[in-house]
Structure formats: C-alpha cells, structure tokens
C-alpha cells in the first residue's frame, strides 16, 4: 500500500496514495472511492477501533451508545441524514415540509428502498408502515425496555402517555401493535405508503434533525414476527435486515468487522462506497502505529506528542500524509445563573447586576484564549474547532 497520514489527530494511508474517509453513507457495488488526488482510487479501506469500544447491540432502536451507532448506521438508514456541515439531508425521506408553526411535519418517502438480509437478498419493501412499527417498538416498554424513549416522548403528541400505558401493562404490552399506538392518539400517521406525518407537542422548527435520531428508524413487522421480540431486540449481523449502504461480510468479535456494499442500496447511484471496508480492533496506539507503518491500516489517530514530532521535522516522511480529523460531535456550553442568592438566601446584587450586562457575559467568550484547548483536538488548525458547526433554524 502507498502511504498517507491522518493529521491534526491522525494518519491516513491509502492504496495508491489517495486520501479517502470512512463516511458511512458511501456508491454502487464495486464503485471506486472518491479520489481527489489523481492517484489510484482506494477500493478497500482498513480502519480501526479501540478494543474497549466493541459493539454491544446491533439494534439501533434498542441501543443508546455512540459505539454501536458508529457501526450500525453504516447498515441501517433512517428518515434523515446530515451533510458534511451538519445540516439535515435526505435519506429514506426524499423531501419534507411543515405547517406555519412547525408543529406538524410531513415526510415524503422514497419508493425504492428495500430490506435485505445478511446475504444481500431482498426480503421486503420499506413503506411508511415500517416507521410506525419502529416507533411503536421504541415506545413499548415491554419490547424495548425503556431505551431511546426521550426524543419521541419529549416531542411527539401522546408519545409519553402511550409509553406510560405500556409500562403499566407490563408483559401484556408485548401484544400491542402500531395500530394500538395510533388508536391511543400518538402523533404519527401514515396516510399512504410513502407519506409519514408527525404532530409535535410544541412548535419545533428543527424537527427534521430530531427525526434523524435512531428512535425514529424503521423496523419490519415481518422480521419481528419471524425472530420474536427477544431475539429481535438482541439481533445481530446474521439475522438483522439491512437498508443502509453496507452489509456485514464478516464479524469476528473483538477482532474485525468487514463490510461490503449492499447490492440493493437505494442511493447507490449518488454515493461512493469501498468494495470492502474493514475495521480492526486495536488495543493501543503503539500497535496501531506499527500496523500503519506496515501498511496494514489505512488511517490512525495521532496523539499530540507524535504530531509535534512529525511537524517539527520538515523532512519527516509523514508530513505530507497529515490530514485533519473531523471534530467530535459534541459541544460545550455555559449556563449562567441570573438570580443568584447569597448563603443567607438574600439576592447577590453585584453578581446579578453584572451577569445581566451583555458585555460582561461576552467576556467569558472573548476573554478566553481557547487555542491551547482546541489544539488537543486539532493541533494543525486549532481555531477551526470554533467554526465546524451548523446553526439550524430555531
């Protein structure tokens, strides 16, 4: 393999020397990966994951961990996705709109999305009903064991009440189906096979991003009936159904996961996928660096000291291979107390007066030099950490 290094936080190597990334929603079976350098395109991609971050659940409706989502979102698509700026983008929903006060949202679904099994064979067509089944599963305390309920119960009319009902019913709630959810007044509807509507408790101009969350992913009633509730809850790569860009070719727990393109992926003409993508479990970064140097990994993260070693030597072979790693999907915020009291319960007049002043509050931002902190995440271009975000409406 030719070399390449991920930089601000890692190394990136590529067969033939091209740079690529593992973006999850990546083109038709056998299509070549994106290539911006003019070098030989990278067809097979070998990435890594820490050994202590092995997947625990293959069921996105049940799982609440980023570790699981990093795997299964390559295999299972939802209503919405996001572009490289974090803005909501189409997935199974091709378009959407809302009413004037953003309480009623309507999603129009593609009519060419299929469920496939682990062998890539089509099992069933996806319609709006699959999203009804998925939401009922999430809101049913007996089926999903109270996981992933926060988003729908916070935003959707009647969702919290239905969840509480299933909790009170105990094991008997396992016999409920999506029609019972609709009859209970939960704010979701499917007027036809390719239209899905949600009614929110309050105006929610950003609900398109909420609808991207795994709580709103589809599920097949046929698969649930085939496996049974407990087995579907604990499904794995061999018995789950797929609707995302990849299917799992091989999974060796604690060792590797190999993905190949889903031969029936609905968006194959518009995206690029690797012919094979392998994730190797790594116990420590020293081993990762050795594998990278032996061209057994296509990318790896670098710690700050290693980046400093590379960048301080203009002749270091890895300087030309450094590239910035995408920022973590998290943010930090300050919440001010505008009515602070003293220990004796009386108002803290000085603080309350100061914090009410806009210029004083801005000092917390303007007066902080965060460059050193940002360098921990992006040593090459630390101030870019300030700008890698998308501010949505509302």
Question: Residue ranges of each PLM-predicted region?
Answer:
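C-terminal motif of bacterial Sec signal peptides marking the signal peptidase cleavage site
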Residues: 11-14
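N-terminal low-complexity, Pro/Thr/Ser-rich intrinsically disordered segments
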Residues: 26-46
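N-terminal lobe/hinge region of extracytoplasmic solute-binding protein
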Residues: 48-101, 241
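Gly/Pro-rich hinge or "lid" segments in bacterial periplasmic/extracellular proteins
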Residues: 168-185, 189-195, 199-272, 276
